[in-house]
UniProtKB/Swiss-Prot annotation:
Name of the gene encoding the protein in the UniProt record: QCR6
Keywords, in A-Z order: Disulfide bond, Electron transport, Membrane, Mitochondrion, Mitochondrion inner membrane, Respiratory chain, Transport
Spans annotated as Disordered: 25-89
Principal cellular location given in the protein's record: mitochondrion
Protein name: Cytochrome b-c1 complex subunit 6, mitochondrial
Gene Ontology biological process terms from the UniProt entry: aerobic respiration; cellular respiration; mitochondrial electron transport, ubiquinol to cytochrome c; proton transmembrane transport
InterPro entries: Ubol_cytC_Rdtase_hinge_dom, Ubol_cytC_Rdtase_hinge_dom_sf
């Protein structure tokens, strides 16, 4: 197992244990309800005009049941913010440096005698620079959304 894979696995485990699951913002929740209402109206139009009053009453009851059964897909606001900041100018530079380092390490690992090397390059420094930037950039916005 390479150093990058080990760091990646460690990071994923750390995120799972440390990062709390964040509920969707009220705006996202309202948008999802509006989309579901629009879908319900489309279904009613497809059913035809026969006994419209009876169909609407039945469809309303069915929609309520479906809403309860369907699990709403909640997006993690932290991940959304991280992706946003990875695409900023500073974020792109840090991601680029990390990916370059990862490529160098991957190439070194494939060369013979890698296991015997005294100093093996890892990308811990680049990784932590990237994570530090993402954490400091996302934290204020995330907490503002959670208020």
């Amino acid at each position: 197992m390479g150093m990058l894979e080990l760091v990646g696995e460690y990071w994923e485990q750390l995120k799972i244990t440390v990062v709390p699951v964040v509920a969707a913002a009220e705006d996202d929740d309202n948008e999802q309800h509006e989309e579901k209402a629009a879908e319900g109206e489309e279904k009613e139009e497809e059913n035809g005009d026969e006994d419209e009053d009876e169909d609407e009453d039945e469809d309303d009851d069915d929609d309520d049941d479906e809403d309860e059964e369907e699990e709403e897909e909640v997006t993690d606001q932290l991940e959304d913010l991280r992706e946003h900041f990875k695409n900023t100018e500073e974020g792109k530079a840090l991601v680029h440096h990390y990916e370059e380092c990862a490529e160098r390490v991957k190439i070194q690992q494939q060369q013979p005698g890698y296991a015997d090397l005294e100093h093996k390059e890892d990308c811990v420094e680049e990784f932590f620079h990237l994570q530090h930037y993402l954490d400091t950039a996302t934290a204020p916005r995330l907490f503002d959304k959670l208020k």
